[in-house]
A protein has these predicted regions:
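Short helix-loop capping/hinge motifs at secondary-structure junctions, enriched
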Residues: 5-13
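Amphipathic alpha-helical recognition patches that constitute DNA-binding helices
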Residues: 12, 16, 139
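Thiotemplate assembly-line natural product biosynthesis machinery
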Residues: 70-75, 118
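Ligand/substrate-recognition segments at binding pockets and active sites
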Residues: 65-67, 83-161, 190, 211, ...
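Well-structured core secondary-structure elements of compact alpha/beta domains
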Residues: 1-3, 188
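Detector for C-terminal structural segments
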Residues: 18-58, 111-120, 145-283
Length: 283
């Protein structure tokens, strides 16, 4: 969410949109079912791996999570906040202005484009006009990395993948105000969210050595993310996709085979171990 846009400075509007999106449709259409759903792994700031999922208290944030396509809940939330359609044109107003937004991603990035169409469809179902726009990447990357911008309201970027700095690096990337006001910002928080409480947590995590306290800090970070909704994940998107052709060779690595061989490239690092286990289909 671009928090330079007045309408999106309202957290009720942000959360209602996030609640209304059909994430299962995104999983099936944009991801072709190749990642966990939010029903499988409820949303947080963490990726779906066991290590990151163990870093926070799931029960403490359970009531703050949503799995999507909750049109009744989103509409009720907007109604309760007085964000209603007062002139009967089918679109809600906020502070006397029609809620009309765009949803953007680079042209040709077909999985992202499919996701943005689903976001736009969700807006229509809760009385918020959302129109998709797909600029070329050369333009897009200049706009979203600017210190401020009012061209794109809802737009897609990425988060950190799996590294030793996670999940701290991802919390920082999603919410740290240190990136605000920076021209050519490729580091994160492209929506320009600012919250001194999360900034304090981001500073505390790297120097905290007590495991219980660290879990408390991560849990509080997840709470802030789910309550304020500065951005929202559309999918668990792998950094790499893995596919094999088993017409000639078989017994490629699998996450559940107990061998713990990284599957992304059988000629890189410990991935080479996979070559020793391959079996000819017709020896």
């Amino acid at each position: 969410f671009n928090l330079d846009i007045p309408a999106l400075q309202n957290s009720t509007v942000r959360k209602a949109i996030a609640m209304a999106v059909d994430y299962d449709a995104i999983n099936q259409n944009a991801m072709t079912g190749q990642s966990p759903t939010f029903a499988d792994v409820p949303r947080s700031c963490m990726n779906p791996t066991p290590g990151e999922q163990a870093s926070f208290d799931h029960d403490a944030v359970k009531d703050l999570q949503w799995i999507g396509n909750d049109l009744d809940g989103a509409n009720a939330m907007l109604d309760a906040a007085g964000i209603v359609d007062s002139d009967g044109d089918g679109w809600r107003e906020l502070d006397g202005q029609k809620l009309s937004l765009n949803a953007c991603c680079p042209n040709g990035w077909t999985d992202w484009m499919a996701a943005m169409e689903i976001v736009a469809a969700a807006g229509e179902k809760i009385g918020i006009e959302i129109t998709t726009e797909f600029p070329e990447w050369s333009v897009y990357q200049t706009v979203v990395t600017a210190a401020t911008q009012t061209d794109y309201d809802i737009f897609m970027m990425w988060t950190d993948s799996a590294t030793p700095a996670q999940p701290w690096g991802r919390v920082r990337m999603l919410m740290s105000s240190e990136f605000n006001g920076v021209e050519g910002n490729w580091s994160g928080n492209w929506g320009h969210y600012s919250n001194p409480d999360i900034d304090t947590i981001i500073k505390q995590i790297p120097v905290e050595t007590d495991a219980a306290k660290l879990k408390e800090l991560y849990t509080e970070a997840v709470k802030i993310y789910l309550i304020d909704v500065p951005s929202f994940s559309l999918m668990y998107r792998p950094d790499k996709f893995h596919a094999v052709n088993e017409s000639v060779w078989t017994n490629f690595p699998d996450s559940e085979d107990g061998r713990n061989i990284p599957p992304s490239d059988c000629t890189d690092g410990y991935g080479i171990a996979a070559l020793y286990d391959l079996e000819l289909v017709n020896p």
